[in-house]
């Protein structure tokens, strides 16, 4: 069951809090609550980068956007308990387990008076985002159904290529190259842009035009860098066809799209802090304004 309330502030690698109460309305900030791919990896070897699965928050003007609901969503939820009531727009790239497993533990969704607008694509088998989030909370997987959530949940089905307007926030979507499909999101506000592009596999012979277009001239690109080229093309255990990309492909995309800053995301569960330190050094040698995502890290878009 979800936490009823945090007994103390959840420790994070950053001092930033998920609050909009004292934020200027000119702020456009990206904050990372879960940066790991596939499965959560708590432990002493993942302290600096974090072990929670995918969850990214964007705060811009009066809007709060949440991308994916991995285990990092639980941590974000505990921070949101400090500022009720909460309204947010939640966008799911897809519904592989590491992107939805935190949703049943998202405490604010159980509290009346909160409101969450939830978006996701219809799956190839025809199921909606509502049905897939609800299904993981059915017996024998979870003790209570989604109907126990007392917040106002408003579900919206998307088709890749859709463009949404949330007042002065523009959100563009694009199809990504991932098993059972995934969606990338481009968020533009006040003339500045952040792109959430995870769970996508590059093409070996060309750049992905969908991703380049989505990332065009972005201030910040969050990109799936689950593997290194050495892992991806490994003769004995290749990862071709697994639906993920490399930091090297991310740098190629960033250069082709004119991206200002790239943040490598969706770290492989086998990559510990020391390994990721080495990857970050290589990334920065290839693209000066590049880095790896860390839990708690905040990046100003403006």
What is each residue range found by the language model?
Residues 67, 93, 198, 223-225, ...:
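Active-site flanking residues adjacent to catalytic metal/cofactor-binding acidic residues
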Residues 203-295:
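Cap/insert and terminal regions of metallo-dependent hydrolase folds
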Residues 2-195, 203-206, 211-212, 277-302:
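Binuclear metal-dependent hydrolase catalytic cores
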Residues 121, 199, 267-268:
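Short strand-loop junctions, especially beta-strand C-caps/beta-turns
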Residues 37-40, 199, 227-232:
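Short regulatory "switch" loops immediately downstream of catalytic or recognition motifs
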